[in-house]
Each structure stands twice: as structure tokens, then as C-alpha cells.
Curated annotation (Swiss-Prot):
Protein name: Protein OPG055
Domain of life where this protein originates: Viruses
Organism: Vaccinia virus (strain Western Reserve)
Family per similarity comment: Belongs to the orthopoxvirus OPG055 family.
Keyword Transmembrane helix applies: no
Keywords attached to this entry: Late protein
Disulphide bonds in the chain: none
Function text: Stimulates increases in peripheral microtubule dynamics and may increase the motility of the infected cells, contributing to cell-to-cell spread of the virus. Seems to inhibit the signaling via the GTPase RHOA and DIAPH1/mDia.
Induction line: Expressed in the late phase of the viral replicative cycle.
């Protein structure tokens, strides 16, 4: 469908006829709506290429951003646990179907009205979730899939299989539209939670009746290798972060035990005239020494893991990882944390 825009000279000529009567008058809403609608439609994607051979389904990747907090705020703040867990050999994620008004999805619709929103899903990824192999396939094989990032509190990446589109860390509002037959591979999630809205775009009745050609999708082997390497790197990073969290929890427990034993020994020394069991004090001191040895060992091991994580995490993502590790502390005693964290530096 084409659009005819009047030339500048004709527009000026029409305007000059009524120049005296419209100087103080605001443009009519009807004209403003027409211009706005035209501009919006011209900015939209086109998923069908018109050629001499007919309508051909495009194999392009469309990247944009959306004001998701305004459009999908209720989905972002939804804490319901009605997601279905998918936990397979190389795939872990949570998913549930949702109903989204078409008006909120206008930005991913095509300008020619050849595709319509069919099914919508929310995909939630937690720390360690994601795809090490394979991809998520939703929707019509002759349609498109819009992947919209609603929330990302960690380091969340994705790869459109067979293309050069590899995102190591998606930002809130990032939107990617691709052929549904390609699928979407969510890379292993590092740190906090991420939520994606997946929209299946299916051919309209008008397009089906007109007819269209579905060409074979292209493939980028170098990108496949890069995505696999990145996925394995993220798996290693997650494993080291989990180890670091475990060491931190063990260290806090060791500091807690050390404080308790030291206080008990002080109590025994204060009442030395009453408590004459020197063997008891020797046992307590021995336990304190063992605890301090454990602390030293854990500190050395922790330093090694921190060095590994630093080498794997991108510099711009270190604050996200640091915040996630801090939130994972199990012992919440302020005194214990003060004693332990003042002597330990877990920041990457």
C-alpha cells in the first residue's frame, strides 16, 4: 500500500487561501490524527517484501526499544507463582500464557497489516536458568516472534539462532522481532531475575488469501560458534558465583563460631576460681584455633574464585554481580556481618 504526501508548494497554496481566517485557529484534530497515523505507520516494520515473484516473507531482524513500564507495568510487578517450570537437560525457564491488548503491541505490528498478534507468553529467568543448547519456539512457522525485555535485574542475554544477533546483556525495553522458525535462545541467566514478553505474530487472512512465499532461512555458522562459547562461559561464571556465595556463607558461620567460642573462653577465664577444668579451656582454645584455620583457608579459596569471576564477568556487569552476591547472604545478624564483612572484600 502506498501513501501520497502532497508536495510542499501545493500545501502552501492551499494554506494561502485561508491565511486570514486560520491564523488564530488551531489545526483541526482530524488533520493532526491523519498526520500522526501516517508518521507512525511509516516508522513501523514491514515483514513482507513485494517483488516480481510475489510477496516474500522477509528474513530480517528488527531491533528497537519500547516504553515497557508504561505499557506492561502490571506484568513487571506481578509476583504470582503460576508460571510453569520447564526443566530439561539443557533448558530451564518458567513460562505462562498471558492476554495482552492489541493496542499495547502496536509497535511490533507491521505497517501493511499483514500480521496480527496471536499468542503471548511471559518467560521468567532466574539465576542459573536459560538455554545451553536449543531454543524456544513459539507461534506460527510462517510468522514472526517479538521478544520484549520487561525486566532484567541480572545479566541476561539472548541469541537468535542462525543470525549474527547475540546480546550479552539485554536492557529493559529492548525489543527483537525475528522469524518464528528461528526460535529464541536465552543465554544462561547470571544474577537477578529477568522477565520477557514473547508475542507470536501470525499471518492475517488478507495475507493468506493474497499468498506469499516462505524462503529458506539463512544461517551464520560463525555466530553459532560464538553463541556456544558465550553460553559455556556464562555456565562457568554461574558455577564460580555459586561457589563464592557458598564460601561467603561458610565464612560468616565460621566468624560466628569464633565469636561464640572466644566469648565462652573469656567467661571461663573470668570465673577461673570457680571453673577449674583446665581441660575445658584447652578444648575451647583448640576449637578456636581450628576455626581460625578454616577462616584462613576459606579466605584463600575465596580470593582465587574472585579472581576467576573477575576474568569472566564484563566490567560493566560487576556491580550487578556484587549486588546479587550480597543479597544471597543467609545469616542476617548485623553483628556477625559487621565482624565478617569488615575483614573480607568480596567485591569483584
Amino acid at each position: 500500500m502506498g501513501f501520497c504526501i502532497p508536495s510542499r508548494s501545493k500545501m502552501l497554496k492551499r494554506g494561502s487561501r485561508k491565511s486570514s481566517s486560520i491564523l488564530a485557529r488551531r489545526p483541526t484534530p482530524k488533520k493532526m490524527n491523519i498526520v500522526t497515523d501516517l508518521e507512525n505507520r511509516l516508522k513501523k516494520n514491514s515483514y513482507i517484501e513485494n517483488t516480481n515473484q510475489g510477496n516474500i516473507l522477509m528474513d530480517s531482524i528488527f531491533v528497537s526499544t519500547m516504553p515497557v513500564e508504561t505499557l506492561f507495568g502490571s506484568y513487571i510487578t506481578d509476583d504470582s507463582d503460576d508460571y510453569e517450570l520447564k526443566d530439561l537437560l539443557n533448558v530451564t525457564y518458567n513460562i505462562k500464557p498471558v492476554i495482552v491488548p492489541d493496542i499495547k503491541l502496536d509497535a511490533v505490528l507491521d505497517r501493511d497489516g499483514n500480521f496480527r498478534p496471536a499468542d503471548c507468553f511471559l518467560v521468567k529467568l532466574k539465576h542459573r536458568d536459560g538455554f545451553t543448547k536449543g531454543a524456544l519456539y513459539l507461534g506460527h512457522s510462517a510468522g514472526f516472534t517479538a521478544t520484549i525485555c520487561l525486566k532484567n535485574e541480572g545479566v541476561s542475554g539472548l541469541y537468535i539462532p542462525g543470525t549474527s544477533v547475540i546480546r550479552s546483556n539485554i536492557c529493559q525495553g529492548d525489543t527483537i522481532v525475528s522469524r518464528s522458525s528461528r526460535g529464541v535462545q536465552f543465554l544462561p541467566q547470571i544474577g537477578g531475575e529477568a522477565i520477557f514478553l514473547i508475542v507470536s505474530l501470525c499471518p492475517t487472512k488478507k495475507l493468506v488469501e493474497t499468498g506469499f512465499v516462505i524462503p529458506e532461512i539463512s544461517s551464520n555458522d560463525n555466530a553459532k560458534i560464538a553463541a556456544r562459547i558465550l553460553s559455556e562461559k556464562r555456565k562457568d561464571t554461574i558455577a564460580h558465583i555459586n561457589t563464592l556465595i557458598q564460601y561467603r556463607q561458610q565464612l560468616e558461620l565460621a566468624y560466628y563460631n569464633s565469636c561464640m567460642l572466644t566469648e565462652f573462653l573469656h567467661y571461663c577465664n573470668s570465673y577461673a576460681g570457680t571453673i577449674k577444668e583446665s581441660l575445658l579451656k584447652e578444648t575451647i582454645q583448640k576449637d578456636i584455633n581450628i576455626t581460625h584455620t578454616n577462616i584462613t583457608t576459606l579466605l584463600n579459596e575465596t580470593a582465587k574464585v574472585i579472581k576467576l569471576v573477575k576474568s569472566l564477568v564484563d566490567k560493566e556487569d560487576t556491580d550487578i554481580v556484587n549486588n546479587f552476591i550480597t543479597k544471597e547472604i543467609k545469616n542476617r545478624d548485623k553483628i556477625v556481618n559487621c565482624l565478617s564483612l569488615s575483614n573480607l572484600d568480596f567485591r569483584l
